[in-house]
A protein has these predicted regions:
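Conserved hydrophobic register position within alpha-solenoid helical repeats
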Residues: 67, 107, 187-190, 231, ...
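Terminal, low-structured helical/coil segments at or just beyond the last alpha-helical repeat
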Residues: 274-313
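Bacterial Sec signal peptide processing site at the extreme N-terminus
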Residues: 14-43
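Residue-level detector of extended alpha-helical repeat arrays and alpha-solenoid scaffolds
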Residues: 64, 104, 120, 187, ...
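Amphipathic alpha-helical scaffolding segments comprising HEAT/armadillo-like alpha-solenoid repeats
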Residues: 40-55, 77-96, 116-176, 199-218, ...
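Short inter-helical turns and helix N-cap capping residues of alpha-solenoid HEAT/ARM repeat scaffolds
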Residues: 59-60, 99-100, 130-135, 182-183, ...
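HEAT-repeat alpha-solenoid elements in large eukaryotic scaffold proteins
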Residues: 23-29, 61-74
Length: 313
């Protein structure tokens, strides 16, 4: 009976426009065994994201993440100011301090769809805390370099060791925070989302991560090529004159060095200014010196055509 019901629901799911991935997740979940019709019903007619995110006690991480993916900004969808403030606080907590990287991803992505003036600052904080460490762990002194610890017995049979095996100051627990790949992915998502806020402070932050402010003021993660590429993508979407200045600097720095960064910065410059100039740093410096004017934002169709033409070159 259970197997027959699963097959029937799966077949029906293929005919529904609700998203086959969500339906498949539902019918293969433990909840489907306990309450199949209720589980499928929630996929076809999902619960209000505001209700899910406000639930007390909190819903499961999976439910909250899916609610964040469906979430629309209350202030732009007939919500109250109280709705806006509460949801923004919920997303801020999830994006900057949640123990689950999955929930952080979902919250950061949701914030990227908001137009609230507070979003840029939240996303920049989320970038800074993407390592997954708690405040206490971040403030704790670092343990000594393991390479500086001389093993028991010393380095020579004829000489007594000056230090023995375990340093008393070395922490005895494993590494804290997220894995490096997870940290990098979270930072990239933050940069792409902060670029969609179109705020001057967002452009300045992205420029710092992209490496235009010099080594002395480098942001955490700016030595990661993928993070720098995400910063350039963020600048390409951030419709501010400072973004054009930063992209021109990246193009100048990376021409003949990093092909990907140079190509991305050139694409961003053309997108923001509407000027179809070659990837010559000198010509783009002239544009900056003449005074930057941001071109009207292209429609989705125009953007698709521009991208297709650009990547065929």
């Amino acid at each position: 009976m259970y197997r027959a019901l699963t097959i029937a629901v799966a077949a029906s799911a293929a005919l529904l426009p609700t998203g086959c991935a969500n339906m498949w997740d539902a019918i293969t979940s433990r909840k489907f065994r306990d309450a199949p019709f209720k589980t499928v019903g929630k996929v076809i007619s999902p619960e209000d994201p505001l209700v899910v995110l406000r639930a007390d006690p909190p819903r499961s991480g999976d439910e909250r993440a899916k609610a964040m993916h469906r979430l629309k900004e209350p202030a732009r969808n007939n919500g109250t100011q109280e709705d806006q403030d509460q949801i923004l606080d919920t997303l801020k907590q999830a994006a900057t301090a949640d123990s689950s990287p999955v929930l952080r991803f979902a919250a950061i992505e949701a914030l990227g769809r908001f137009e609230d003036d507070r979003v840029a600052a939240i996303l920049m904080t989320a970038y800074q805390t993407a390592d997954g460490l708690t405040e206490a762990e971040r403030a704790a002194p670092k343990g000594p370099d393991p390479s500086a610890v001389i093993p028991v017995g010393g380095t020579s049979a004829s000489r007594a060791p000056t230090r023995t095996g375990i340093d008393p100051g070395m922490p005895l627990k494993g590494p804290a925070g997220y894995a490096p790949d997870t940290v990098s992915a979270l930072r990239c998502r933050c940069l792409e989302s902060v670029g969609r806020t179109h705020k001057p402070e967002a452009a300045r932050f992205l420029a710092t991560v992209a490496g235009t402010a010099g080594a002395d003021t480098a942001a955490p993660g700016s030595d990661d090529p993928e993070v720098r590429q995400a910063a350039v993508r963020g600048l390409s979407n951030c419709r501010q004159p400072d973004s054009v200045v930063a992209l021109a600097q990246v193009l100048k720095q990376e021409s003949g060095k990093d092909v990907i960064l140079a190509r991305q910065s050139h694409a961003g410059l053309m997108k923001l200014t509407g000027k179809q100039l070659p990837p010559d740093p000198t010509k783009w410096d002239e544009v900056v010196q003449a005074g930057v004017v941001i071109a009207p934002e292209p429609t989705k169709l125009e953007s698709a055509i521009q991208n297709a033409v650009f990547w065929k070159k």
